[in-house]
Amino acid sequence: MFEKLFSPIKIRGMELKNRVMLPAMGTKFSGKASYVTDQLIDYHVARVKGGCGLNMVEVCSVHTPSAPRGFLSISEDEYVPGLKKLTDAIHAEGGKAGIQLSQGSMAVGMDQTAQILMASDMPMEIGRASCRERV
């Protein structure tokens, strides 16, 4: 059933060592400043060593003020060296890296520090507590 899972695959010139993919997540290992940290690098390197052929690196904000705290950013050139260091570490272990770009918007939820950007004004209700009858 899984004969091809651990076999290499070529996608438009990029060869993956297998078909195992780590989806993008928000580990919040980048801390409040949204930069790549050693903890984040270690996390992704461990996933490659564990067998992932492709790591989708985090939820990465294209507009830092609208991102939840602790999420990576790629909104300014100053973030690029850290992202390159992370990518190089993944490549050094034989993995490949991709990235999930995010603008934040309503996904920032209740993060009071985020400056939510949206395409247009949208009225929204503040949430309310749930009760046993609703659940």
Predicted ranges, named:
Residues M1-A24, I90:
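N-terminal amphipathic alpha-helix/helix-capping segment at the start of soluble metabolic enzymes
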Residues V20-P23, N55-V57, A97-L101:
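Hydrophobic faces of well-ordered beta-strands that scaffold small-molecule active sites
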Residues L22, R47, G51, I90, ...:
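Conserved, mostly hydrophobic/aromatic
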Residues M25-Q39, R69-E76, M110, I126-R132:
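Active-site mouth loops of central-metabolism enzymes
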Residues I41-H63:
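Catalytic domains of carbohydrate-active enzymes, especially glycoside hydrolases
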Residues M56-V80, L101-A114:
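Glycine-rich, proline-tolerant flexible connector loops at the mouths of alpha/beta enzymes
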Residues L72-G98:
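Alpha-helix-loop-beta-strand connector modules within alpha/beta enzyme cores
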Residues K96, S102-R132:
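Non-globular sequence segments
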